[in-house]
Amino acid sequence: PGSLQPAVELKEGITCTSRGVIMGVVPMQFYLRRYPLLSGMTGTAKSSEDEFWQLYDLKVTVIPTHTPCKRVDHPYEVYLTKAAKDNAIVECIKPAHAKNQPVLVGTSSIELSEELNERLAAEGITANVLNAKNDELEAEIIKEAGRPGAVTISANMSGRGVDIKLGGADESQKDEAVAAGGLLILGTFMSESERGDMQLRGRSGRQGDIGESRFIISLEDEIMTKYEIKKLIPKRHYPTAETGRPIDDKIVLREVDRIQRIAQGDTLELRKRLLKFTMIGEKHRDAVFGRRRAFLTGESTVD
């Protein structure tokens, strides 16, 4: 399907065949349910245990960590405007970089990664930007994200699955990185699920290493406008002017946390509805596959 197959054939110097045709599609939930035994392992399953149970009939069990987690997770730092948030992000990176602390910044898009890189360059800070364009090269770059003084900017999907070691891939400068405070994770947006934010936080503090994570967001971010944060916050509590400082009103911060729970609940409900809609098609699929299997095994014949 698409142009991937012809592109690979041309690259390898073989005869280019016609494009493939999609003969059938199996939703992920039903595909996984076809396995007689189903299990998985992830560091962020607990926050989605309701979804695992309702969609896959799977329970979540927490396995104690081998060593205690020493990472310090700071609460969300919320600003009124995106401009104030952008300034706060740069001001957070500057002192960390000055003391040689490695920094990994997570952004929601390639464009925002490049914008942040330009702002840091104006401050004399050189950063490595990962934008999911070259997985092999970027995997090598992110392995070095734990080296002292390194600043790495990663778009949402890039660099996943790579273990970041303090001091670099060979850990030759680990003592220096530890002395600087370990890997600082800086999130610049709130995910639509707690799991997403925990995945970013979890890039630091692995295997008992020290580290910290911060999230700097604003009331103008996409998730806030999508779920109309302004309507959730009582008028007397909604900030009227940007002060350049984080919002400390507990009512505002409570509603900011609530936004993520609303988004996560909406996503779960959407998946549950899709599951119901595709159930009918799956019954037909089971019937067709059953007949096909019977023909292939000789248990049935065509009249």
Can you name each region flagged by the protein language model?
Residues P1-A83, N87-I89, A132, K143-E144, ...:
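A contiguous, basic/glycine-rich beta-loop/short-helix subdomain that forms a polymer-engagement track
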Residues S3, G24, L37, A45-S47, ...:
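Conserved nucleotide-binding/hydrolysis micro-motifs of P-loop NTPases
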Residues E12, P36, Y56-L58, N100, ...:
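Short glycine-/polar-rich loops that comprise or flank the Walker A/P-loop
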Residues M41, I63, G106-S108, E123, ...:
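Generic beta-strand/beta-sheet core signal
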Residues D50-P75, A84-P102, E111-T126, L253-R261:
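Helicase motor core with emphasis on the C-terminal RecA-like subdomain
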Residues I93-N100, I110-G182:
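Conserved motor-coupling elements within RecA-like helicase/translocase cores
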Residues D175-D303:
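C-terminal helicase module of SF1/SF2 nucleic-acid helicases/translocases
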